[in-house]
Amino acid sequence: MNTQIIAIANQKGGVGKTTTCANLGIGLAQAGKKVLLIDGDPQGSLTISLGNPQPDKLPFTLSDAMGKILMDQPIRPGEGILHHAEGVDLMPADIQLSGMEVSLVNAMSRETILRQYLDTLKGQYSHILIDCQPSLGMLTVNALAAANRIIIPVQAEYLPAKGLEQLLSTVNKVKRQINPKLQIDGILLTMVDSRTNFAKEISALLRETYGSKIKVFSTEIPHSVRAKEISAEGKSIFAHDPGGKVAEGYRNLTKEVLKLEKQREKNRRCFSH
């Protein structure tokens, strides 16, 4: 099984990374894919939003898995992986992950510890999605070093030029120095309030500024109060409000992501002949 590893990254917080990771992951599972979600944020937002309100009480989290890799200790198959009712698996995170980030600084091959952990799981999943923390620290670099694709959620409230430039330069650096396979799938506009002209302007501006270099997904995720409520319930938007606009947005995003995959696979085959 050729595992697709997708990092959901933006060093700005509050742009819909966690919501996108959970709902795209569950969308892919509904499309028949075998999906593992990785919570790469010490705050544990993804872990909490998938129904684990106290991540610190979990017996095994991502920091334990990375710790075992650092110490060269074996990891049991499936160790610490949780199963969600909507068909995805989860490797949770808790606050210990911030301590792990500190210990990575002096570790040998510090950028690839997460990649080495994911290598132990690769044949078991068609897709692994990583919810990155809102910073460009060592954990995010680990996620970019492990991924072959990246999706960048951007809130449609203002032009994120500076932050985006910073993120893109980090992506290019990782691609050059550590992970030549890394490709940007696209920029995803989130929390779009279609009633305002402002969101339309930002959308047009983003497409104008980056569209020639980077795909901007044609799917836009609408702003919704209900989407905010669900993270407390441990369910996806598909379970909470299947007929709503946000669920439709994530269904369309899932289709776009799969279409992109097919296209790349086709191109790869053409090149290899």
In which residue ranges do the predicted regions lie?
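P-loop NTP-binding core
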Residues: M1-H273
